[in-house]
């Protein structure tokens, strides 16, 4: 594997770490409703667990309400139960065939708790990015040892990977700041 291939591989893996972090952030409930909040909810559909998006249409009623409309009338109860049982503290209300999920306002204590959760998730994402940097640097050392590249190429490769690491860590920090602002906004 060459320096360029190693850098490209590392960048792709770092991008995947960022995507995973974005998905984790989307699960953190803020005071505002958004359809991504229910993405991880699993519904018992005739004996098998499937994502809620496969059995219902999810939309926004207003800024603080998610509307869920199951495609089959008899699934209303199962979908409502799945939303109630997910660990988001939501209390869905069924109105005919439509389930309305109001977002309860967050207490100050809960906001601070969520901020800590976000920071913890961010630290995990940063560690993943740094581990990828370490793996790339080990790969460069191995290439030098095998005489596939020069020490100058190794140094350049390490510098480039460090720049990528800095870029992705800064992106994580930016995402955390935005999410904290969103959480703390009353």
Curated annotation (Swiss-Prot):
Pfam families: RRF (PF01765). Its main location: cytoplasm. It is found in: Cytoplasm. It comes from the Bacteria. Gene3D superfamilies: 3.30.1360.40, Ribosome-recycling factor. Belongs to the RRF family. This is Ribosome-recycling factor. The gene is frr.
